Swiss-Prot record:
PANTHER family: 26S PROTEASOME REGULATORY SUBUNIT. CDD domains: RecA-like_PAN_like. Keywords: ATP-binding, Chaperone, Coiled coil, Cytoplasm, Nucleotide-binding, Proteasome. Belongs to the AAA ATPase family. Residues 391-393 are annotated as: Docks into pockets in the proteasome alpha-ring to cause gate opening. PROSITE patterns: AAA. Homohexamer. The hexameric complex has a two-ring architecture resembling a top hat that caps the 20S proteasome core at one or both ends. Upon ATP-binding, the C-terminus of PAN interacts with the alpha-rings of the proteasome core by binding to the intersubunit pockets. The keyword Zinc-finger does not apply. It comes from the Archaea. GO terms for biological process: proteasomal protein catabolic process; protein unfolding. This is Proteasome-activating nucleotidase. ATP binds at residues 178-183, 317.
Amino acid sequence: MSGDFDTIRDASSSDEVQLVRLLEEKIKSLQIEIENLRKELNYYKAEMEKMLSPPLIEAVVLDVLPDGRVLVRSSSGPNLVVNVASHIDQKLIKPGVSVALNQRGSTILEVLPQKEDPIVKTMEIVEKPNVTYSEIGGLEEQIKELREVVELPLKKPEIFREIGVEPPKGVLLYGPPGTGKTMLAKAVATESNAVFIHVVASEFAQKFVGEGARIVRELFEMAKRKAPSIIFIDEIDAIGAKRIDIGTSGEREIQRTLMQLLAELDGFNPLDNVKIIAATNRIDILDPALLRPGRFDRIIEVPLPDFRGRTEIFNIYLKKMKVEDNINLELLSQLSEGFSGADIKNVCVEAAYMAIRDGRNKVTMKDLVDAITKINVKRNNMESMKERREKYS
């Protein structure tokens, strides 16, 4: 009989232990839930504070007074003399800096980041160009001149300070289309480890009055902040053509943009870590003000490649391709007289397509010769179309 009581007592005690464990687990889960709810409550409190807090007023610093107060031009209208909050670093308060004011006491509570126009921001090449001088054929003299003007002042400015001369501020590359002007600019940016800012001059021609000049100004400001940097202005004749008085609003806006570009070229130090490279196919129509000393001092012609240059360019492109061993570079160069570097690249691509159509994985000499013939026919057709257009226009 006593054994039965012992069994019942043992069973009840084990149930109690199990119940205690369940209650402990329940308490732990409730504690976790309470902690999550507390975090959620704090989050919503912070969001409520954000929504109920009054908006700040944007202003631009005009001057810093001797007593530490600041003269600002507020976006709401008047100029104000305001104090600076204690948590703001006084070194950040400079003329031209954007700040945020509270609405009650007009105290500077925050220094706003530098504003950048989206159009200007997209001009910057974030990744460094991967073009090297070894990928450019037949332009040894042009590379030498470009390195002297752009790369040397960026890497060793002390040489020019010691001698007492200022290097050219800008370089103008001119020549027929497809001769490698853009590749030269990218190569010098690669070798000098500089930020490459590529812009086509037609992007400066904006719809509204003053927009083009503002973009030019902000472009140069960004280049100074990102220094060392290289600004490459392609097709500069789009805004740099000779000024003529035809009276249209569009022409006047382009002239204002050109004048802003000239002012920016005049306004920076040649030994600063910013260099300007411009390119054009039509140097004959450029405004003389662009070409005068002190702006684009070094003017470099990038001509069509000669026999040796074409041989080098063919060698550069064919080294990257699967070709047969019997390729005669001299013959290819002879057959492609008058071709630019871009034309030679097209020849190599066209030859590769011919091999692909025939189911081969190697390019033959015949493919290259046929490709030259095909490109030549296209070039002749384009020239004849141009002649007919000029005749009947």
